[in-house]
Amino acid sequence: VKTSQTGYIQRRLVKGLEDLKVEYDMTVRNNKNKIIQYSYGDDGIDPIRVESQILPLVNMSVEEIYTHYQMPSDNMKDDVFTTSYTKPTLKRLKKQITDTNKRCKEIIDMMIEYRDTIIKYVFKMRDNKKVNIPVAFQQIINNVRGQQYINVNSMVDITPLEALELIDDGYKRIESFHYVKPTELFKIMYYYYLTPKNLLMVKRFNRNAVEILIEK
């Protein structure tokens, strides 16, 4: 039943909605430029809390961080290291050792600095390593591996440096998104899980698999 009171409420709602507009940053604001909705058409659910994941970096020592990232390129005669690569790839790898070590060192230094930062400002010195971000990195990596039928005997046709270049290019594309720029925590997770040592030596990803992974 419509009464004078419900009619008044309806009029206020209509007049209020007339003042709403979607700005260029995709936020919904009123006539006083106050944010009513952070994303136009959003369902109000915080997507950052969709995936609860482990970030082992916070409990890693400097030596463990080096072990996680540094490619064992000092000994090219090590069968464990070389047998996974195709012969043409191995030739390219030998020529790229210096550049590979240089880029790995840059990432290691970055992650050591990030480790100290997130312990202090994200976990606030608490003994915790769970984070909530909308991308399940480990699950995506395993899905791509399964979809491409990669196993422990698969041959790798991409060098660590070439993989790093694809990984860096992938992050730059994500970073170029104007409205949804990645957070520092996303960057840490991205470079923690997407390492050539894990993808190439452990998971045995080939070039096609790495490209598919980056696109996802």
Positions of the model-derived regions?
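Long insertion/accessory domains within large nucleic-acid-processing enzymes
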Residues: 1-66, 196-216
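Core mixed alpha/beta domains of very large multi-subunit molecular machines
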Residues: 1, 55, 59-216
